[in-house]
Amino acid sequence: MPSVPIVVDDDPERAASAVRGYVARFVSLGRRGSNIYHRLMVDAGFGAAADRIQDHTAAGEHTAAAAAVPFEFLDRTALLGPPDRIAAGIRAYADAGVTTLALSPFAADPDGRAAALHVAAKAVAPTRSTP
């Protein structure tokens, strides 16, 4: 089951900033040839970025590693932006055959994380019709 970061924000680029460090840490685990997250980036067409992330991390440059995570990669693998964009992302996962998502809400506090999950729940809730 895919684990998907979710950040609700009017600005998708700003939302992406909240998860860059998280993604960089996973891409930097272990060696290039054996890291599934590095391989995911390579397979998605972001091999040079994945290598830069690992190089920066190996040099202790964690801020640079996070900055090297491309928005385009995050936009394909996370739910970022305002509620309508989050809903469209969830629909894209469903259209690809995903039936269950494990969401990882990124927010500064528990209320923000709960609000992000509420946005996701509203996106998948069946629409009620009035008789």
Where are these regions (language model features)?
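Active-site-adjacent structural elements that line small-molecule/cofactor binding pockets in enzymes
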Residues: 1-131
